[in-house]
Amino acid sequence: MGPAVVFDCMTADFLNDDPNNAELSSLEMEELESWGAWSDDTDQSV
């Protein structure tokens, strides 16, 4: 469920509607910066 949540968060823009994801969003943002290469590309697609 760990990795699934990560991808889910990125796909749903960190699911801002979910307060639980608010904590993840901090970690996710750092993760995105790490692999922001392909993440940035996906963001443009969406």
From Swiss-Prot:
Post-translational note: The precursor peptide is first ribosomally synthesized and then highly tailored by specific enzymes to yield the final natural product. These modifications include several methylations, cyclization and the formation of t-Leu and Thia-beta-Ala residues.
Propeptide: 10-46
One BP annotation, GO: defense response to bacterium
Outcome following mutation: residue 4 to V: Leads to the production of bottromycin A2 instead of bottromycin D
GO cellular component: extracellular region
Keyword Zinc tagged: no
The keyword Secreted belongs to this UniProt entry's keyword annotation: yes
Location in the cell: Secreted
Keywords carried by this UniProt record: Antibiotic, Antimicrobial, Secreted
Function in brief: Bottromycin D is a ribosomally synthesized and post-translationally modified peptide (RiPP) that displays antibiotic activity against methicillin-resistant S.aureus (MRSA).
Protein name: Bottromycin D
Organism placement in taxonomy: Bacteria, Bacillati, Actinomycetota, Actinomycetes, Kitasatosporales
